[in-house]
Amino acid sequence: MTNRLVLSGTVCRTPLRKVSPSGIPHCQFVLEHRSVQEEAGFHRQAWCQMPVIISGHENQAITHSITVGSAVTVQGFISCHKAKNGLSKMVLHAEQIDLIDSGD
């Protein structure tokens, strides 16, 4: 089964960095996406806020470059996590994050 998602947007919440009891670093943030997409010949506004998590020592360098307002493209897979309130939420598990150059 295929499970791939590529989403570009802006980091809209301060990244939360933690280390698991087994020593694996994790970085969580929320990505806000806004765009215009074409559907059935019509333009429509597309908008979402997607929780993102990236894990592992090999990703530490990029996670320390991410701040609120950073424009990024995230590639990975989606999975459901159960929130503290008992509700399920979809989360993008990042395998690659690229900073988007603002052109400044």
Swiss-Prot record:
This is Replication restart protein PriB. Homodimer. Interacts with PriA and DnaT. Component of the replication restart primosome. Primosome assembly occurs via a 'hand-off' mechanism. PriA binds to replication forks, subsequently PriB then DnaT bind; DnaT then displaces ssDNA to generate the helicase loading substrate. The keyword DNA-binding applies. Keywords: DNA replication, DNA-binding, Primosome. Residues 1-101 form the SSB domain. Involved in the restart of stalled replication forks, which reloads the replicative helicase on sites other than the origin of replication; the PriA-PriB pathway is the major replication restart pathway. During primosome assembly it facilitates complex formation between PriA and DnaT on DNA; stabilizes PriA on DNA. Stimulates the DNA unwinding activity of PriA helicase. GO terms for molecular function: single-stranded DNA binding. It comes from Enterobacter sp. (strain 638). GO terms for biological process: DNA replication, synthesis of primer. It comes from the Bacteria. GO terms for cellular component: primosome complex. Gene3D superfamilies: Nucleic acid-binding proteins (2.40.50.140). SUPFAM superfamilies: Nucleic acid-binding proteins. Signal peptide: none annotated. InterPro entries: NA-bd_OB-fold (IPR012340), Primosome_PriB/ssb (IPR000424), Prisomal_replication_PriB (IPR023646). Belongs to the PriB family.
